[in-house]
């Protein structure tokens, strides 16, 4: 992680994580 979320719970609600078939995990919505 490039930063530490002060409101980590809210970050989890905001971000959408998807695990791709090849094993990668991408997160969209909460990147800075």
Curated annotation (Swiss-Prot):
Transmembrane segments: none annotated. It is found in: Cytoplasm, Cytoskeleton. The keyword Nucleotide-binding applies. The keyword Iron-sulfur does not apply. One of its GO terms (cellular component) is cytoplasm. Belongs to the actin family. This is Actin-2. It comes from Pseudotsuga menziesii.
């Amino acid at each position: 992680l490039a930063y530490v979320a002060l409101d980590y719970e809210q970050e989890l609600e905001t971000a959408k994580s998807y695990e791709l078939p090849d094993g990668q995990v991408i997160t969209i919505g909460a990147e800075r």
